[in-house]
């Protein structure tokens, strides 16, 4: 009969739940989930945002495009995704695709102010739209992330990705560890791009 010491028993008792939590978190960081908002605003494109220049604006200029909304952070270990996101943007931009990046210090890895973020993005060759630093979690989260939270998915870390259709409604959520060059993301973008533009449909 195998005898276990009290110390080993305690370690096992606490270690297994912790391991389960780590595995669950890792799975969510790599998750690809179809999503749909439950209420609130009808479209991402009607929401207010703050630009890197500190001006209040909206996302109206991107209405009718497929958008990938990403929470970014300059000092995150996943910041290598910046150039990968740029490649993705260049691949699909002429087909009606845009990446909308929202810097946040909610995970303590974006210490820069808006001016500093501009410098970082310029140094990394980023040409897709980047907005002012904001909250993406909690009671102070921005209107954009309040809207996206209605999908039931919230970022666990930097570089989580929401794919939004031409109608401004979320289509899918991709965890932080899903690479911008992943086949799953490319397929989802292409499916969304194949959907008809709701503005053109109204004109017809």
Language-model features: locations:
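N-terminal secretory signal peptides that target proteins for export/translocation
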Residues: 1-7
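Hydrophobic membrane-insertion alpha-helices, especially the h-region
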Residues: 13-26
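N-terminal "domain-start" segment that seeds a small globular fold
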Residues: 30-60, 80
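Amphipathic alpha-helical repeat scaffolds
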Residues: 51, 71-75
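Loop/turn elements at helix/coil->beta-strand transitions in domains of secreted/extracellular proteins
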Residues: 64-67, 94-98, 124-129, 158-159, ...
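Structural microenvironment flanking redox-active thiols in thiol-disulfide oxidoreductases
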Residues: 78-141
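Thiol-/selenol-based redox modules, centered on thioredoxin-like
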Residues: 143-146, 150-204
